Amino acid sequence: MLCLPVFIILLLLASPAAPNPLQTRIQSNLIRAGPEDANIKTDKRVIISGLLASILVPLIDAIKG
């Protein structure tokens, strides 16, 4: 009779430890995929305008006082 509770406890402990096959497959695909595969392209104009905005806005605020 002691085997049944021990079996149930072991079953409960082992089930969360098993990986989700879909999740591991998606993770492995994401690891192998590069930015060019995901159509992620950084636009230089966006980067430059962001840098200029972060520099110019405090400068203009300081000049206005």
From Swiss-Prot:
Transmembrane segments: none
Entry keywords, A to Z: Amidation, Cleavage on pair of basic residues, Neurotoxin, Secreted, Signal, Toxin
Protein name, per record: Conotoxin VnMLCL-041
A cellular component term, taken from the record's GO annotations: extracellular region
Domain of life from the UniProt record: Eukaryota
Localization: Secreted
Keyword Signal: yes
Tissue localization of expression: Expressed by the venom duct.
Keyword Oxidoreductase: no
Note: The mature peptide does not contain cysteine residue.
Family according to the record: Belongs to the conotoxin T superfamily.
Residues that make up the propeptide removed upon maturation: 20-43
Positions of modified residues (Lysine amide): 64
Gene Ontology molecular-function annotations: toxin activity
Signal peptide segment: 1-19
